[in-house]
A protein has these predicted regions:
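Basic polyanion-binding and macromolecular-assembly surfaces
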Residues: 1-38, 42-374
Length: 374
């Protein structure tokens, strides 16, 4: 029996541009025959991962970089300052033995630049330490490379996955044996109704020009910023069994569930945030622990909400509550546990869907519900 944690969020965004396309416009998608505001899953995952970065104990957070030679060499030097002169050579040897292809940085002719991997590599702090420790142990062997190969070097980076690697996965082109399947899936956030993009025309004043009576009074700079507003439906799911497999420990798995739920619910990509300050909390949240399958409920909004005097959020909440109840009635699929939270009076109808939990305790309570399934 597989266990899943589904997270459903309805959140109002004021005029903003949290996730823009290559033209600078807020991302969008056609759904239900109309254009909707969209926030990409990649941007949401990045914001979620950044949010729980400071909440994870040392070693349980990963780093994604091409500069793996620099990372390993620095760790060797920190542990054994006497090996500083050899650290780069050792790091390159070890990483090549693991299977990473290293090359000179593109477009940089500096002799000080160390070799890089050809792609971003996602490693946990513990894995970097394991590689450094193994290299230190063979540093004074007659043939360090041969001695290192005897340590089964790939195993050094295929155990002790950090929480973020276990959740979001790791794709390695070479060696692909180091791939880690992601335990979470994140949907693109989608507006519940049609969106209209607008433009903010702005001018920047040249302070020195303003002080000069003889200078022209024109602006120092003019431009436009495209923005939109919407109530969006956000969804993510965690495969708890796969998360446990990736992490190898029940307690760490529970902590990962807690962190992900809290950070997914309360984080948001920060595009143009200094211009729009669009840091809102969700209007309403439903977290369900299931033992059947994940269920994305975006179908509740395939027919776009048409805003009236009550805006988008209130009718969207009503629509979602009715959709979820009807879905249970028609399918017979019931969650093991349903937890709800809301931050505005219009979200109170979510009380029909499950047990009310304060937003600050949602992740902790979800982790407790997961423990109850064992």
């Amino acid at each position: 029996m597989s266990v899943f944690v589904d997270i459903h969020v309805l959140q109002t965004l004021p005029p903003s541009n949290p996730n823009r396309d290559d033209t600078g416009a807020p991302k969008s998608a056609t759904f239900g025959g109309v254009q909707r505001m969209r926030i990409s899953s990649q941007a949401i995952k990045r914001a979620t991962r950044q949010d729980f970065e400071g909440k994870i104990a040392d070693g349980n957070y990963g780093v994604r970089t091409k500069k793996i030679v620099e990372l390993v060499a620095r760790t060797i030097t920190e542990k054994r300052p006497d090996l500083e002169a050899e650290s780069i050579k050792l790091a390159e040897m070890g990483l090549k033995a693991i299977g990473f292809k290293l090359a000179e940085p593109r477009g940089n002719k500096s002799d000080k630049e160390l070799k890089e991997s050809g792609f971003l590599v996602f490693l946990s702090a513990k894995q970097i330490e394991h590689v450094a420790d193994a290299l230190i142990s063979v540093a004074h062997e007659d043939d360090p490379a041969a001695a290192f190969k005897e340590l089964k070097p790939r195993s050094l980076v295929d155990t002790d996955h950090s929480i973020d690697i276990a959740l979001f996965g790791r794709m390695v082109a070479e060696p692909n044996a180091l791939n880690v399947d992601a335990a979470c899936q994140v949907a693109h956030a989608i507006g519940v109704g049609a969106v209209e993009h607008e433009y903010d025309y702005y001018t920047a004043v040249d302070d020195e020009k303003k002080r000069n009576d003889e200078a022209d009074e024109g602006a120092g700079m003019i431009g436009t910023i495209e923005f939109a507003s919407a109530t969006v439906y956000r969804y993510a799911t965690i495969n708890v069994d796969l998360l446990r497999e990736n992490l190898g420990d029940d307690a760490v798995t529970d902590r990962a569930v807690e962190l992900f739920v809290d950070s997914f619910v309360r984080s948001m990509p920060t595009g143009k945030v200094t211009t729009f300050a669009n840091r809102t909390l969700p209007d309403a949240v439903l977290v369900q622990v299931r033992n059947d399958q994940p269920i994305n409920m975006s179908g509740a909004f395939e027919e776009p909400i048409v805003a009236g005097q009550h805006g988008f959020a209130k009718p969207a909440i009503k629509r979602f509550v009715e959709f979820e109840a009807r879905l249970r009635e028609l399918t017979g699929l019931e969650a093991v546990e349903s937890l709800v939270s809301w931050t505005t009076p219009r979200g109170e109808s979510f009380s029909e869907l499950g047990k009310q939990v304060r937003l600050a305790s949602l992740g902790e309570t979800a982790a407790e519900a997961v423990r109850g399934t064992r």
